[in-house]
């Protein structure tokens, strides 16, 4: 799955430089990291649910996940500060490119009723957030062996300075954005 990184350096890099009239190659936006996050939801007090989340994340990303804990106490969710909530993995370099290729070529096509990614999911700084309602769109997660279907969030952090640069970068990489109406 190295072809996505190769595609970036051979085609996308030059197209971005020409499109935005960048003078220096260091100005061209690139993907710096991908953060994958999954929570146990209302089962966060259950230690087995947290372990299942960490196992699923490790299977999906190929890297060991670490626990995330609550920053604040919330009585409505029966959550106390420091209580484990889920897991998180930060991917960089080759693992990042492999995971993005898996998302593009395997996970997104398996999403039911997919109508394109929302361009509104950019944060204002060129970073893109993508959510999956079901983790079973990834081939490593089999429906028979999981206790509960959980969703996960994928945050693509770029070096883009604004949303237009980030959008063009991901669009040229092949991310299927929904057409503006």
From Swiss-Prot:
Q: In which domain of life is the source organism classified?
A: Bacteria
Listed InterPro entries: Ribosomal_uL5, Ribosomal_uL5_bac-type, Ribosomal_uL5_C, Ribosomal_uL5_dom_sf, Ribosomal_uL5_N
GO BP term, example: translation
Q: Which gene encodes it?
A: rplE
Query: Subunit comment for this entry?
Result: Part of the 50S ribosomal subunit; part of the 5S rRNA/L5/L18/L25 subcomplex. Contacts the 5S rRNA and the P site tRNA. Forms a bridge to the 30S subunit in the 70S ribosome.
Instruction: Kindly list the organism's lineage.
Output: Bacteria, Bacillati, Mycoplasmatota, Mycoplasmoidales, Metamycoplasmataceae
Q: Which GO terms describe its molecular function?
A: rRNA binding; structural constituent of ribosome; tRNA binding
Q: What does this protein do?
A: This is one of the proteins that bind and probably mediate the attachment of the 5S RNA into the large ribosomal subunit, where it forms part of the central protuberance. In the 70S ribosome it contacts protein S13 of the 30S subunit (bridge B1b), connecting the 2 subunits; this bridge is implicated in subunit movement. Contacts the P site tRNA; the 5S rRNA and some of its associated proteins might help stabilize positioning of ribosome-bound tRNAs.
Keyword terms: Ribonucleoprotein, Ribosomal protein, RNA-binding, rRNA-binding, tRNA-binding
Tell me the protein's name.
Large ribosomal subunit protein uL5
* Pfam families per the UniProt record, alphabetical: Ribosomal_L5 (PF00281), Ribosomal_L5_C (PF00673)
């Amino acid at each position: 799955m190295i072809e996505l990184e190769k595609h970036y350096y051979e085609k996308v890099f030059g197209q971005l430089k020409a499109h935005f009239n960048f003078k220096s190659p260091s100005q061209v936006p690139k993907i710096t990291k991908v953060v994958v996050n999954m929570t146990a939801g209302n089962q966060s007090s259950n230690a087995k649910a947290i372990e299942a989340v960490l196992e699923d994340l490790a299977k999906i990303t190929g890297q060991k996940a670490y626990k995330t804990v609550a920053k604040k106490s919330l009585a409505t969710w029966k959550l106390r500060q420091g209580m484990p909530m889920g897991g998180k993995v930060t991917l960089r370099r080759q693992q990042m490119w492999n995971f993005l290729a898996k998302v593009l070529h395997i996970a997104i096509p398996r999403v039911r009723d997919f109508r394109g990614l929302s361009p509104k999911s950019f944060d204002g700084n060129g970073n893109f957030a993508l959510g999956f309602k079901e983790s079973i769109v990834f081939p490593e997660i089999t429906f028979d062996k999981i206790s509960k279907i959980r969703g996960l969030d994928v945050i693509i952090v770029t070096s883009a300075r604004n949303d237009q640069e980030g959008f063009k970068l991901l669009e040229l990489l092949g991310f299927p954005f929904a057409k503006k109406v």
